[in-house]
């Protein structure tokens, strides 16, 4: 990952955790 991907990866990861948390 690099550039925007580097910033989006943790965001998507957090969203994934929230979805699985539900």
Swiss-Prot record:
GO biological process: defense response
Record-level GO cellular component terms: extracellular region
Source taxon at top rank: Eukaryota
Localization terms from the record: Secreted
Key words, A-Z: Amphibian defense peptide, Secreted
Known tissue expression: Expressed by the skin dorsal glands.
Purpose: Lacks antimicrobial activity. Does not inhibit the formation of NO by neuronal nitric oxide.
Family classification: Belongs to the frog skin active peptide (FSAP) family. Rothein subfamily.
Listed name of the protein: Rothein 2.1
UniProt organism field: Litoria rothii
Lineage summary: Eukaryota, Metazoa, Chordata, Craniata, Vertebrata
């Amino acid at each position: 990952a690099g550039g925007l991907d580097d910033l989006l990866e943790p965001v998507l990861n957090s969203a994934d955790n929230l979805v699985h948390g539900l």
